[in-house]
Amino acid sequence: MSTLLLEAAPNTVLGNIIVVSGAFIILLVLLRLFAWNAITSVFASRAKKISDDIDAAEANNKQAADLVKQRQAELAGSKEEAANIIQVANDTASQNRAKVLATANEEATSLKKRAQEDIEQERKEALNTVKGDVADISVQIAEKLIGQSLDASAQQELIDSYLAKLGE
């Protein structure tokens, strides 16, 4: 009996291989008929999604690079604009400084001129006052020396001649 089992065993293994192979082929045919399109469509959709994601990432990278270039250009423009604003402010400050200095110089010149005019006026008034005082003193001295009073015209002639002598 045991020999019979041993002799039948090689046939069973061969039979098993044939049955399993047949089942596998049937399974492949069934998979091909019912599931192959679904499986390949899943793989195709996954491949398409990955491809779209890669394209989107590349587009985003390009957009980011463009945005960086734009921001750098704007920054350069802002720096240039700031430099222009500073230059304009410096120019305006220089012009204002020049105007203030010119105004101050004009005011100083005007004040100096007015002061000189005031000094000249005061000098003239002082001379007139001194002339009047000298005339009064001269008349008093002349009255005492002559012993008589002088009339207004004689007094004026005496003053003028005295002042003329002082002026020489």
From Swiss-Prot:
Principal place of residence: membrane
Gene Ontology MF terms: proton-transporting ATP synthase activity, rotational mechanism; proton-transporting ATPase activity, rotational mechanism
Transmembrane regions listed in the UniProt entry: 11-31
Record carries keyword Glycoprotein: no
Keywords assigned: ATP synthesis, Cell membrane, CF(0), Hydrogen ion transport, Ion transport, Membrane, Transmembrane, Transmembrane helix, Transport
Alphabetical list of InterPro entries matching this protein: ATP_synth_B-like_membr_sf, ATP_synth_b/b'su_bac/chlpt, ATP_synth_F0_bsu_bac, ATP_synthase_B_chain
Membrane topology term: Single-pass membrane protein
Keyword Membrane set for record: yes
GO cellular component: plasma membrane; proton-transporting ATP synthase complex
Cell location: Cell membrane
Gene3D superfamilies: F1F0 ATP synthase subunit B, membrane domain
PANTHER family: ATP SYNTHASE SUBUNIT B, ATP SYNTHASE SUBUNIT B', CHLOROPLASTIC
The family this protein is said to belong to: Belongs to the ATPase B chain family.
Function according to Swiss-Prot or TrEMBL: F(1)F(0) ATP synthase produces ATP from ADP in the presence of a proton or sodium gradient. F-type ATPases consist of two structural domains, F(1) containing the extramembraneous catalytic core and F(0) containing the membrane proton channel, linked together by a central stalk and a peripheral stalk. During catalysis, ATP synthesis in the catalytic domain of F(1) is coupled via a rotary mechanism of the central stalk subunits to proton translocation.
Assembly behavior: F-type ATPases have 2 components, F(1) - the catalytic core - and F(0) - the membrane proton channel. F(1) has five subunits: alpha(3), beta(3), gamma(1), delta(1), epsilon(1). F(0) has three main subunits: a(1), b(2) and c(10-14). The alpha and beta chains form an alternating ring which encloses part of the gamma chain. F(1) is attached to F(0) by a central stalk formed by the gamma and epsilon chains, while a peripheral stalk is formed by the delta and b chains.
HAMAP family found in the cross-reference section: ATP_synth_b_bprime (MF_01398)
Name of the protein this chain belongs to: ATP synthase subunit b
